[in-house]
Amino acid sequence: MDNIIKDIYEKIVPPLKKLFEDHNVGKDHDISHALLVMNNCKYAILESKEKYSIENTQNMLLASILHDADDHKLFSTKNNDNLKKIMKIAGYSKEIIMKVVEMVELVSSSKNGDRL
């Protein structure tokens, strides 16, 4: 998992941080929040009784850090374009990008409402 997190810090964090800064995203959804969510995801994976594949672990961590990249309250993008652009530039395959998009959409309270 350490290599996955290292890649995310090198390839995803800088453009995501720039995106948030360029759009004056507040502290409630800035890079610190994204990193906190990813860290929570990491510990959930480590504590889970499930044993996830490397690919699923990577995808869950990517989805957790990128979950606000296209939040409609923050951006006017369509079809998760910010997320896709960041991941494409970082060198992720189209297949992985689409899996991460699916994960983000499944957990999005903006798209699915707060069901609790």
Tell what function each PLM region has.
Residues 21-23, 67:
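Glycine- and acidic
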Residues 12, 16, 41-44, 83, ...:
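Hydrophobic alpha-helical packing residues
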Residues 25-59, 72, 85-90:
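Alpha-helical phosphate/pyrophosphate-handling elements in metalloenzyme active cores
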Residues 56-116:
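Divalent metal-dependent catalytic cores for phosphoryl transfer on phosphate-bearing substrates
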Residues 1-20:
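Short alpha-helical hairpin
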